Amino acid sequence: MTPAPAAAPERSAPGTGTVAGRVPAPAPGASVVVVLEPKTARTFPEQDEAPVMDQVGQTFSPALLIVRTGRPVKFRNSDDTLHNVNVKEEGTRVQAFNVAIPTDGVYEHTFPHDGFYRVGCDIHPAMAASLFAATTPYVTLAEDAGAFSFTDVPIGAWKITVYTAGRKLERDVDMTAGATQITIE
């Protein structure tokens, strides 16, 4: 029996490369956010469509939503009961907004700056989620073993930031054509 051919490596567009690596693995039920930011000003393409945080089964879904700063985000209520969405900046607890959303209702908001936000429902206090807003489109959640990757990263100087278990880890990355591997512990 002939073995199956190996998968072709993921290729990036000309003038770009791939950044992949490993960060501390998330604890069970937790998330590790990995952010790749340019060290010099860049413009990024618009997002295809607004991300959505839904309220379904008296739960926010997803539990952690990644959004782009300055771009719209939708908050939807798919339950058959009234909910509200109360969003506060994580560090300062400054309220971003607090709105009631009826059944099948949608509220749209644009986050003005980067960072973590706590999301709750005052009507159902057990409902809680988080949101991370970033200017860069290069934001991902690490896999269970801590692996992550970004494709089509323009060549240049970048900073990678990892948010894990209350810690913030940072490292500079010089992106060259091809693949760049990085481990952050």
Give names to the regions the model predicted.
Residues 1-185:
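Extracytoplasmic copper-binding redox domains, predominantly the cupredoxin/blue-copper superfamily
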